[in-house]
């Protein structure tokens, strides 16, 4: 759709250098971008970096920010029962410091995958989960976008988990989505954040070009906007750390104390949950279960949806 209204899509192109061009008054005017591909070099007024977890612009321009990553892989499977819900499992046996998912799609198809801090063992954990559950006899297939004849294998990669990069704007450039580190550090969802940040960046860049001002100060409007909108990552990270300190039994007890919807709870409802936990397993309150519950609330789809 974007191409229909003027965008140009260049496949098999890889950026290797980005050079700022300045006028005689030392004011930034445009970019000269080079790389591997027939259309290079390319000149443009501004750059929105949506290069994913690699963060191309951040590395090429040495913006002095790094992100921690987690491994995420999934299979596409067939004949998977679909009750209309997404299944998520906090199951350390199969996904240390992560979780497993089953995301149903049309026609009995589903994406079954996991994220874990154990990047080398991720695919083995996924295979074990499928083999040990109701999915064992379900056929695996390659996703539609993969070429015919290729061996069936999981697809995925790394996902940023440490929160936003400290710097998401610079002269003439804005980082969005995974390139900016925008994923939930608890559940690693990032599609909602990528869509929101891409739209916000486009609006800010459009206005900045109209004003002929692509300075850091002008583009900082974007960074202020996401800082205001996104929930506090540091609180979610505290909750995540506390969550993975719980045993399987403690997680189950906590889950049975929760309502179906964690958002918009009144202070009285929150107190009620605390009382339930106190009676069922008092030690949970000493294991910082409250930050866990708060991080669940912050990580609802309203804020960090897929």
Feature-to-residue mapping (PLM):
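A general structural signal for short secondary-structure boundary/capping elements
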Residues: 91-97, 119, 136-140, 148-152, ...
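A broadly tuned preference for mixed-charge, low-complexity surface segments
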Residues: 93-106, 157-179, 226-240
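Predominantly flavin-linked oxidoreductase catalytic cores and closely associated redox partners
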Residues: 3-144, 160, 165, 181
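FAD/FMN-dependent oxidoreductases across multiple families
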Residues: 14-17, 120-204, 209-210, 216-220
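C-terminal helical "tail/cap" subdomain of flavin- and related membrane-associated enzymes
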Residues: 206-306
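Conserved FAD-binding subdomain of flavin-dependent enzymes
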Residues: 1-4, 203
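Repeat-unit-sized solenoid/scaffold elements
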Residues: 1, 115-125, 197, 264-274
């Amino acid at each position: 759709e974007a191409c229909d209204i003027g965008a140009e899509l260049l496949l098999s192109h890889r950026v290797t250098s980005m050079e700022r061009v300045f006028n005689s008054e030392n004011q930034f005017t445009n970019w000269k971008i080079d790389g591997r591909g027939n259309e290079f070099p390319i000149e443009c007024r501004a750059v929105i970096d949506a290069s994913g977890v690699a963060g191309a612009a951040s590395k090429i321009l040495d913006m002095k920010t790094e992100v921690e990553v987690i491994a995420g892989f999934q299979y596409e499977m067939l004949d998977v029962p679909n009750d209309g819900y997404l299944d998520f499992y906090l199951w350390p046996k199969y996904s240390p410091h992560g979780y497993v998912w089953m995301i149903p799609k049309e026609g009995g198809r589903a994406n079954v995958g996991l994220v874990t801090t154990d990047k080398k063992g991720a695919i083995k954990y996924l295979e074990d989960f499928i083999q040990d559950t109701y999915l064992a006899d379900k056929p695996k297939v390659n996703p539609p976008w993969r070429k015919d004849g290729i061996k069936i294998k999981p697809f995925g990669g790394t996902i940023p988990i440490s929160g936003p990069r400290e710097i998401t704007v610079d002269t003439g450039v804005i980082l969005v989505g995974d390139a900016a580190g925008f994923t939930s550090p608890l559940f690693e969802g990032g599609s909602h954040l990528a869509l929101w940040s891409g739209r916000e960046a486009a609006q800010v860049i459009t206005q900045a070009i109209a004003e002929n001002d692509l300075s850091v100060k002008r583009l900082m409007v974007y960074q202020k906007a996401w800082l205001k909108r996104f929930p506090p990552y540091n609180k979610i990270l505290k909750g995540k750390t506390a969550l993975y300190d719980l045993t399987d039994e403690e997680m189950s007890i906590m889950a049975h104390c929760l309502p179906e919807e964690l958002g918009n709870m009144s202070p009285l409802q929150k107190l009620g949950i605390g009382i339930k936990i106190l009676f069922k397993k008092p030690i949970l309150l000493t294991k910082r279960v409250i930050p866990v519950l708060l991080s669940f609330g912050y990580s609802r789809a309203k804020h960090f949806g897929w």
